[in-house]
């Protein structure tokens, strides 16, 4: 019975996290962490490490799908990624010094806020408009944005997907598909750095079964989500992304309430 419960929880967590990653560039940690803590009793800091590890392959396969459809900006994304990686380690260390509850609430609020934003105020920027932004200005913005996102990534226990999506669309002026593609590309590396940092700082060996199941299920559903997202129109993608984020936000909020 305990094994069945573990499989079901990991399946649901992986499904939500994978679709969120592939469809909206959301970090798997925003969904997986509270699910593991609430229903399997895994310590929050260890759950964050498992969630970030699940993020790595899910983000990688999603970024490959977006890149194949020419919805990925590797050049500018790489600049942001360097600073994200540096500050991810700092944020991860600070997170280990704080209570569990401090780590969980931010992701939920950010997820629901972005969900509402995409429905009420959809991102309709075109690739042409995106490319017209001054290159030097974008480099400076990427550096400061990367530092902030990296710290939040390590601190909250998320790949920084929601923060990156918000900044890429609202601050750097990316069109939605390219923003999601670039976000998951960066998140592949931030999640890898964050998960290794969490496991090293935590010192305990994570539950291998839970880790394996979360990685597999998240990867499968991320692939499905990314393929659907790349075929959708911008208007439909905004609505679908908003709906998914709000639903996942409510589910995670419910999990936290049960806890």
Q: What is each stretch, according to the model?
A:
Residues 18, 48-56, 180-191, 245:
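Transmembrane helix-bundle signature of multi-pass membrane transporters/permeases
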Residues 23-32, 157-167:
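Transmembrane helix boundary and interhelical junction motifs in multipass membrane proteins
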Residues 33, 53, 57, 112, ...:
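Alpha-helical transmembrane segments of polytopic integral membrane proteins
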Residues 54, 182-199, 209-221:
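A small-residue-rich subset of transmembrane alpha-helices
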Residues 42-50, 75-79, 173-184:
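Membrane-interface alpha-helices at helix entry/exit sites of multi-pass transporters
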Residues 1-19, 33, 37-39, 44, ...:
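Juxtamembrane transmembrane-helix boundary motif
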Residues 126, 158-163, 174-178:
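Short, structured loop/turn "capping" segments at alpha-beta junctions
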């Amino acid at each position: 019975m305990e094994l069945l419960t573990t499989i079901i929880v990991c399946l649901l967590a992986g499904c939500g996290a994978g679709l969120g990653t592939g469809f909206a560039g959301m970090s798997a940690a925003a969904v997986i962490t509270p699910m593991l803590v609430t229903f399997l009793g895994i310590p929050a800091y260890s759950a964050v490490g498992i969630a970030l590890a699940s993020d790595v392959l899910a983000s990688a396969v999603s970024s490959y799908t977006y890149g194949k459809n020419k919805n990925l900006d590797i050049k500018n994304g790489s600049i942001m990624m360097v600073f994200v990686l540096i500050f991810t380690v700092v944020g991860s260390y600070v997170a280990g010094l704080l209570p569990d509850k401090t780590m969980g609430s931010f992701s939920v609020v950010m997820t629901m806020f972005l969900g509402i934003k995409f429905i009420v105020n959809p991102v309709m920027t075109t690739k042409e408009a995106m490319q017209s932004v001054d290159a030097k200005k974008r480099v400076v913005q990427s550096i400061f944005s990367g530092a902030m996102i990296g710290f939040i990534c390590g601190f909250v226990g998320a790949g920084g997907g929601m923060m990156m999506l918000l900044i890429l669309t609202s601050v750097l002026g990316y069109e939605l598909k390219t923003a999601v593609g670039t976000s998951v590309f960066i998140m592949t590396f931030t999640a890898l750095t964050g998960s290794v940092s969490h496991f090293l700082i935590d010192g305990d060996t994570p539950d291998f079964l839970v880790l394996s199941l979360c990685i597999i299920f998240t990867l499968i559903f991320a692939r499905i989500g990314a393929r659907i997202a790349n075929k959708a129109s911008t208007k439909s993608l905004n609505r679908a992304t908003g709906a998914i984020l709000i639903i996942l936000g409510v589910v995670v909020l419910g999990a936290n309430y049960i806890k």
